[in-house]
């Protein structure tokens, strides 16, 4: 695939990618994020049909975004699409241990290839044109390259809702590091968040030198006013419950934050050694 080549110096290539990307995209693409909404449903053995509450939430987003292109990406649709456009990524996708890893990885691939907005199926839309609604008035004519919102602990970049311009080097970097990050971290929850989830993406964010391309939506604006969670967390396991209980205790919360910082440092070293794939 043309956008990814082997044996690249990461730091040099990020800067080169930004220069090329900024010079090649047209004026309209520079100003606006594509109005394309992506959602992903990958079924498991026990839950082949989408939960009703997810379908209701998805319908709310579709109805409020009739001027957006919309795709619900299923496992079969993803595999067919990857076979045509990203055949080199298909083995990476299939080699994940858990469906949630596949979902997280595909968020980055789809936002890189198409641009637009990704939103989890457990989020109900409450506003039209979410891309514009997430931005202050002075940023709506010339939209930022990437829209994110950060986790409360400052050690993760939430991946439940994200928006980006097409072929952006930030998501190129994310996709290029997924293979190297696909490791077992001894706990189910840690494996999810560190190999492809929010903590993985925060590691990519830390590596990316052009911080001015990001806009961070305040959680106080996002939740309750623009979107509403209808009850997700279907991927959570028993260790997630245990970790959550620890995090409610201040002493354990500090310990867990410290442990995650150490793990992040290890991840950064792994990703630093890895080359683009």
Question: Whereabouts are the PLM-identified features?
Answer:
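Glycosyltransferase-associated regions of secretory-pathway enzymes
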Residues: 1-103, 121-277
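Small-residue hinge/turn detector
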Residues: 104-116
């Amino acid at each position: 695939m043309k956008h990814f080549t082997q044996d690249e110096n990461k730091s040099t290539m990020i800067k080169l990618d930004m220069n090329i990307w900024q010079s090649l995209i047209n004026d309209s693409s520079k100003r606006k994020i594509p109005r394309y909404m992506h959602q992903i449903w990958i079924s498991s053995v026990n839950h082949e049909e989408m939960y009703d509450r997810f379908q209701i939430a998805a319908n709310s987003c579709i109805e409020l975004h009739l001027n957006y292109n919309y795709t619900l990406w299923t496992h079969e649709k993803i595999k067919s699409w990857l076979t045509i456009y990203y055949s080199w990524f298909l083995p990476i996708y299939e080699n994940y241990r858990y469906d949630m890893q596949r979902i997280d990885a595909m968020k980055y691939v789809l936002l890189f290839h198409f641009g637009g907005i990704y939103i989890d199926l457990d989020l109900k839309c409450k506003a039209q044109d979410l891309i514009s609604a997430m931005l202050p008035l002075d940023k709506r004519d010339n939209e930022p390259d990437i829209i994110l919102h950060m986790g409360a602990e400052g050690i993760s970049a939430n991946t439940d809702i994200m928006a980006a311009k097409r072929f952006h080097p930030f998501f190129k970097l994310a996709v290029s590091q997924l293979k190297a990050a696909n490791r077992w971290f001894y706990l189910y929850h840690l494996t999810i968040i560190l190999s492809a989830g929010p903590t993985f993406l925060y590691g990519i964010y830390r590596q990316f030198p052009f911080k001015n391309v990001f806009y961070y939506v305040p959680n106080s604006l996002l939740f309750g006013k623009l979107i509403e969670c209808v009850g997700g967390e279907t991927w959570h396991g028993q260790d997630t419950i245990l970790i959550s209980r620890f995090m409610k205790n201040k002493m354990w919360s500090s310990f867990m934050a410290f442990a995650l910082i150490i793990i992040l440092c290890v991840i950064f070293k792994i990703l630093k050694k890895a080359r683009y794939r």
